[in-house]
Amino acid sequence: MAEETQNTVATESNNEDRKGRRGQRGEGRRGERRNRREENHGDELLDRVVTINRVSKTHKGGRTFSFAALVVVGDGNGTVGVGYGKSREVPAAIAKGQLDAKKHMFSVPRVRGTITHPVQGHDAAGTVLLRPAAPGTGVIAGGSVRAVMECAGITDVLTKSMGSATAVNVVRATVDALKQLEEPEEIAARRGLALDEVAPDALLRARAAGIAEARKAREEAAAAKAAEEKDGE
C-alpha cells in the first residue's frame, strides 16, 4: 500500500513538472509573439494601395483569375518604396505588394516638406513633372502621384502627369523623378560651383529654418524625457 501511494505521488509530481514545462514553453512562445507585435507596431509604415487589377489566364480546362496590387509604402519622413504583388486573393496580393515595396525603399531629399528642385521622370509612355512649392500649397497631384507624395512625406509640391494615364506607369514615372533629386551640395560639387551659385537664396533660407526647427524639436523632446525620468526617480 505504501508503495502504491509513493508511485501515485511520483506520477502526480511528474505530471505537474510536465505541465509546468509546457506552460513555460507556451509562455515563452506567446512572449516572443507579443514582442514581435510590439516591435512591428513601433516600426509602423504608411501604405497606400494605388490600384488592384484582375488578371485572367486561359488554360485547357478554363480560365484562372488572379489579382495584381500596386502598393506604395513609406515612413512619411523622406523614405518611400513601390511594390507589385500578385495572388489569387486580394489580401495576399496586397501583402506581397507591401513586402516588395519595403525591399525597394529609397530616400528622397526634401526641404521643409517640398522637393529640392524641379525634376521630370519617365516610365514607358508616362511622364511626370514635379516642381517645388511654397509652404501651405499642399500636394497638387492626381491620386497615383499623391499616394507616393504622402508616403514620402512631401506636403507641398506641384505636379503634372503627361502621356500614359495608367496607374503603374504614372507611379513608376513618379519614382523615377524622385530618384533624380539631389541635395544642393551634391549639385555644387558636381559642377564645381559655390553653393549659393547653385541653390536660390529662398531654398537655402528655408532649409536653414527647417534644420533649426528640427534641432529645437529634438531638444524639447530630450528635455521632456529628462523631466519624466527625474519625476520617476
Swiss-Prot record:
Q: What is this protein called?
A: Small ribosomal subunit protein uS5
Q: Which residues cross the membrane?
A: none
User: According to the lineage, what is the superkingdom?
Assistant: Bacteria
Under the GO molecular function aspect, what terms does this record hold? rRNA binding; structural constituent of ribosome
Checking NCBIfam families in the record gives:
rpsE_bact
Domain remark text = The N-terminal domain interacts with the head of the 30S subunit; the C-terminal domain interacts with the body and contacts protein S4. The interaction surface between S4 and S5 is involved in control of translational fidelity.
- Using the record's annotation, list all stretches that form the S5 DRBM domain: 45-108
Record keywords, A-Z: Ribonucleoprotein, Ribosomal protein, RNA-binding, rRNA-binding
- Assembly and partners? Part of the 30S ribosomal subunit. Contacts proteins S4 and S8.
